[in-house]
């Protein structure tokens, strides 16, 4: 009875190990796909146009502020005390306004870039899932996360075709 039980458990163990397959792994270069997509350039130009007015306004404010600061340095010692104080206060207020607007501009610009980038990355992710399921891959790893991979395991071109 013990021999039979031992033989049966050994047979089950061998059968279980035989049915376990190695995971089918692929790699994909997401950053290369992102760079090669025409939408990346389109989005960059769109964002540039979206923030162009505010950037121009900030450049004008900066130029005006620099002019006033130069005037204060150049003529400050010969100005009336009241005029110098008025100009100093004006420069401080304008500097604060500029700083606030510049920070808001940077935050808004960064936020919009992330929104658009995430939209594109979502499309890439969907394409990776589709190509992986069609190819029967169990695991897909970003090419930047591995030191070496067999080029035959690279599905970047297939994903790029799917995204375009």
Swiss-Prot record:
Reading the lineage from the top rank, the first entry is: Bacteria
Q: Which GO terms describe its molecular function?
A: unfolded protein binding
Recorded hits in SMART domains, A to Z, give: OmpH (SM00935)
Q: What is any one GO biological process for this UniProt entry?
A: protein stabilization
* Residues covered by region (Lipopolysaccharide binding): 101-112
| SUPFAM superfamilies, per the entry | OmpH-like
Q: What does this protein do?
A: Molecular chaperone that interacts specifically with outer membrane proteins, thus maintaining the solubility of early folding intermediates during passage through the periplasm.
The UniProt family comment states: Belongs to the Skp family.
Q: Assembly and partners?
A: Homotrimer.
| NCBIfam families registered for this protein in UniProt | PRK10780.1
Protein name per the record: Chaperone protein Skp
State which gene encodes it: skp
